[in-house]
Amino acid sequence: GKNATVLHYSDNNSKTEDGDLILFDVGAQYEYYNGDISRTFPVNGKFTDRQKTIYNIVLEGQKIVIDKAKAGIEFKSLNCILKDYYAKALSKIGLISNAEEVNKYYYHGVSHLLGLETHDVGRHNEGLLKSGMVMTVEPGLYIAEEGIGIRIEDNILIENNGCRVLSKDIIKTVEDIEDFMKW
C-alpha cells in the first residue's frame, strides 16, 4: 500500500488491504558479506492492470541497467541510463510530461556497492566499474498518489564483458509472482 512508497518503512504497523502491494527489502549475510534484495508482491496474489504496467516499467529498467553494467562503465552513468528510460516510459503512460518529473517518482540511486556492509563504503558513485565489484541494481518507482511503490533489486558481480546476476533464481516477473502467490 502507501507505505511501499516510503524507501525504508520501518514502523511495520499498518494493515495490508486487498489490492495493496508489499515491498520486501531483504538482507542476508554469508561469512560477513551482505546481500540486499527487493521484490514487490500483490497482497491478494494478482497485480491490477496499473500495478502491472508500473511493475513492468521497473523490470524493464532493471534489465536495461543490468545489460549495460560491466567493467569500464562509469558508475553514475547507470543511473542516467535508467532515468532516461523512465522519462520515456512514464511519459508514454501519461504519468509525466517532461524528463525532470521523473524525480517525483524515482528518488534514489539505481545501485550501491555490497560487501562487509549492506551499503558498502567508498566513493562508489565516482569512477569506473571494475571487475570483481559486487553491487545492487535496484530501480524503483513510487507513486504516492496511487499507493503504488515498486522496487526490484538484485545483486550483480561486475565482470570484464558484462555482469553476473547473483540473485537470478529469485522470481521477479509478473507471471512468476502471480503463479507463486496461488499456492
Regions found by a protein language model. Give the residues of each.
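Active-site neighborhoods and metal-handling regions in enzymes and metal-associated proteins
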Residues: 1-183
